[in-house]
Structures are given as C-alpha cells and as structure tokens.
Amino acid sequence: MNKRTTSSCLALACLTLAWTAHAGPAPDTLAPSATGITTLRCGTLIDGRSATSRRDVAIRIEDGRIVAVGAFAPGAAGTVIDRSQDTCLPGLIDAHAHVLIKTDDYQVDHLRRSSGYKALRGLNVVQEMLWSGWTTVRILGDADVAYAHFDVRTAIQEGLFSGPRLTGAGHYFSITGGGGDLNFIAPEHQVAGDGLVVDGVDAVRKAVREEIKHGSDWIKVLASGAMMSAGNDPNRAHFSPDELAAIVDEATRLGVPVAAHAHSAAGIKASILAGARTIEHGTFMDDESIRLLKEKGVYLVPTLYVGDYYLNEQPGSEAQAKMNELTRKYRAQHIAAVGKAIKAGVNVTVGTDYVGFPVKQGVRELGLLVEAGMTPMQAIQAATRVNAELLGWQDHVGTVEAGKLADIIAVPGDPLHDLSMLEKVSFVMLGGREVLRP
C-alpha cells in the first residue's frame, strides 16, 4: 500500500468519527421553538419511517418537540390544532439548493447584484420554501463572493425572520476554467467567479479552513464540469486526486463533511474514493460508480427536476441553452442510472437544485424519483428521513416520532396516491410553532 493510498484510507476511517463531532450549529438552534403544550390532530399521518400511513392520529408536542404519537381521543392536552381533513408528514428536507440564484443567467447576475441584495432575495426564497413545506434546506454554495446565505441563517436563528433550518457550504470550489469560473471573460479582466476558484493542494486546504471559519458546515467541491455554466464539460473530471484527498482530509479533521458535484463517472469515483459524503447529480455514473456508492454508504442526490424545468418551461433560454441541450440528450440515461442505483440499494435522496424556478414546483423532484423506480412512500422518505440521515440530523428531524423536533407539514388528499398534493401545502409547523404566511 503506497503513501497516498494509506492517507486516503485514514481519511475514510476518520469520516465516521468526525461525523459525531460535526461542526456547525445544532439543528435545534437554527430556528426558535414554541413553548407550552400543543396537540396536532391529523386525519392521516405519514411518519417518515413506517411502510404505511395511519388514520386519525394525535401528535403531542411540548416545548417544540414531539413527546407522543398515538390515536386521537377527545380531551387532548394543550392547544389543539385540527388538521383532521389533511395528511400530515414530516417537514421536507431539500438536500441541494442555491437560494441566492434567481435567474437563468446566474453567472452574469452574480456580477450585477451585491451580496446585500442577494441576502434579501435569498431570505425571500427560503421563506417561500418554508411556506411550501421545506423545513430544512442544505445550501450547496451560491453565486456570491461573500456569505450572504449565512447572514440569512443568522437572522433566522436570532428570530428576526421566519425561515427553515439552514445548513450548507459557503461556496462551491472550482478549478480554473471549471464550472464555477467565468469562462466567457477576456483574460485581461480580473473578475471573481461565481464559485471559489482554487488550485493546488495547499490552496484547497486553506480554502477549506476559510470556508469553515466563515460558517460553512459543509464543503462543496465541483469534481466535474457543470451543466449550467459556460465553457466546461460536465463529462470531465475536475481536481486532481491529490487535491480531492486534501479537501476531504482537511474538512474531515475539522468535523465537516464534503459534498461533491460530479456528473462524470470519473469525477464520481474519484470523489467517493477521496471520502465525499454525498455525490450531487451523478448524470454519467456507471455500474462501478453505483457499486462504490453502495459499498461506501455515500448518498446520491440526483437533482433531476431542474433539467426538466428549463427544458419544458424555458426552452428558449439563451443562458441555459447548454443545459437544455444536455438534458434533451442525456435525460433518459440519467433517469435509468438513478433507477439502477435505487435497485442496488444506494441511498438516493431529494435535492431540488433550486436556481430560481417556482418554489412550489421543487417537490416534482419526488415524482421523477418515482419515474426512476421508487414508490411514492420511498420518495417521501427520501425527502424526510433519508435526508435527515444524510445531514447527520436523524435524532432531530426527518420523522414524526417522540423526541424529534416538531417540524410537521400537512397537505390535502393523499400524496401516496397523488404526489402533486405536495404542491398544495396547507399547514407548516417548525419546532412546534405554526408558521403563518403573511
């Protein structure tokens, strides 16, 4: 075993240990919780863990946490909230969003908007996400030279504004000429890319430290080219094995996991072997990629809907002509590969890749996972329990069980028979507090 292999193995061995000491705010500090006793009556409950739903259920909540789940009976304690005509389920978790990105020409918009403006716009987006049922959101880098979404997170933590629990990465790391660089700018212009452009082992280590210093509790690396940015090929691996190993090693030592954007099979495999916890997209994954995902317990966040959105609803977008061409060409292949991963038992989860489409439509990601081979129940669990496990927050969110934070939503009808019901969220509770839309 050579020195590089030994280092990689040690990094992988450390990953589980580091996870228990995950840096960043605890989930229950990310939004204020209610005080007192509340009973929530649900006509039907999908709890995020059980294989079937239950009828006429009472959820007892004390000081923001669930203390009991059982059959409803008259005389329930505390304030009673009646959702007996609705289906209740755990608050949804979006494992992949870019809340500061609002336009299809985001690489140009990155240059025209200030970080302060992006913070205000991002606050609006995350509030819309909360009202639409997303009670936890992992932000995987944003087109901002500063850390505007962490300012949004702090404002929510301090109770200045309502919003979901936020976690994630400040920026996405890109090689020079990669998916986070501005590859349409003449060389004499020195302009900051929408990503964090960084090259070399020492530079990536320093970048990891700076990201964590400024609030990142995930590190995001573009391990391949991208579908949406100009001048790079998503089917090419980016960052050398040494750079990837250094990124994961540095992040792991500091208790922070790594999310790897990887479309190409080579980028996927290199990221898994380096020790990434999640693979984002996975468009060109092959059988060996799927085997490694399963063997290493790495989560796959395929982000299927964003391509459909641009192809079907913005087919004439000049800014996303590349995305539309690639989606048209490779959509079926991507869906089939995700189906293979599901069948192989890979932890496939839900990430909307939000980049400015109507927030309510993000739940259509679940329908595409059903198209790939999941049942509706599996898709709902992917957006709740499995995503909580991805975050390492399974003791706090993701299921409706005693001991968990009372992050609960309700929808009319039965989403197990019609997933579009998830676009009609009628009730949101965050930490036992009912969230009211202004």
Language model features with spans:
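His/Asp/Glu-enriched, well-ordered alpha-helical/loop segment
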Residues: 112, 253, 257, 322, ...
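Histidine/acidic-residue-rich catalytic or RNA/ligand-binding cores of hydrolases
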Residues: 104-107, 149, 229-231, 268-274, ...
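Active-site gating loops and adjacent loop-to-helix segments of metal-dependent hydrolytic enzymes
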Residues: 101-118, 176-193, 227-241, 296-331
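Histidine/acidic residue-rich metal-binding segments in metalloenzymes
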Residues: 151, 202-223, 227-300, 329-347
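Metal-associated gating/positioning segment near the N- to mid-region
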Residues: 86-154, 158, 176, 242, ...
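Histidine-rich, glycine-flanked metal-binding segment
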Residues: 24-39, 45, 49-89, 109
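Acidic, glycine-enriched loop/beta-strand segments at the rims
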Residues: 27-31, 45-58, 71-72, 375-380, ...
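Divalent metal-dependent hydrolysis catalytic cores, especially in the metallo-beta-lactamase
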Residues: 123-148, 162-172, 216-229, 257, ...
